[in-house]
Amino acid sequence: LNDKNFWDEALKILNIKYHVNNIENIPLYGPTIFVANHPFGILDGLILSSIVSNIRDDYKILINNELSKIDHIKEYLFPIKFGNKKEDVIFNISSKNKSINHLKNGGCLITFPSGEVATSKFIFDQPNERKWKPLIGSIIKKSEPKIIPVKFFGQNSKLFQFVGFFNNNLRRALFIRELLNKKNETFEVQIEKSIENLNIKDLSNHEISDNLKSIVDKIN
């Protein structure tokens, strides 16, 4: 796949299409962070990267380290590890600082602040995301970018939810299956206007992330 069009080409191979509402809300330049919900997994990243890469070429993606092994896209990624080892913390501080510097230099950053795909708490419940990571609040506080909320509509299969209820590692193993079972479908994405009324300086990192999750959850 051609590096520049990796996201578009990957979606084309899968015959996955998307419809974007209010794409004009994406700033054409300047520090910008996209905060998106995470209902599907790999597909969310493919679609949002496709959207943003067709408007701006100064984008990076804050991404789970498990998904950062593809040579074609490594240059666009700031990987994050979700372990508790000392080396994981050091690794994440590096990616966090790179993200902050990228935004301060006028770039844009794609994020999925939950760090985990939405899943059901109980077998027959609707899938929900975990609390968003305070890391996003910290990045925003130190770089002061425009904040663009993004909402994907839909959810993964009942099998994915069922397996996730019992075994989180097995649920992760189903990510590729979930991507492939969405072939030939069209997905809707809502891009909201930049958030202007969030008093970043008066909020903790946790409060910033909680507020942003609430804003995205309410998009319909």
Per-segment meaning from a language model:
Residues 46-52, 125:
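"Short basic amphipathic alpha-helical interaction patches in structured regions
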Residues 93-220:
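Non-catalytic C-terminal accessory region of glycerolipid acyltransferases
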Residues 38-42, 117-118:
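Gly/Ser/Thr-rich loops at beta-strand to alpha-helix junctions
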Residues 9-15, 85-90, 125-126:
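Short, flexible loop segments at the rims of nucleotide/cofactor-binding pockets, characterized by
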Residues 53, 58-92, 96-99, 103:
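Conserved nucleotide-cofactor-binding alpha/beta core module
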Residues 14-20, 90-93, 171-173:
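Short gly/ser/thr-rich secondary-structure transition/capping motifs
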Residues 33-35, 79, 110-112:
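Structural motif
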Residues 1-35, 45-47, 56, 74-75:
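Membrane-anchoring hydrophobic helices of lipid-metabolizing enzymes
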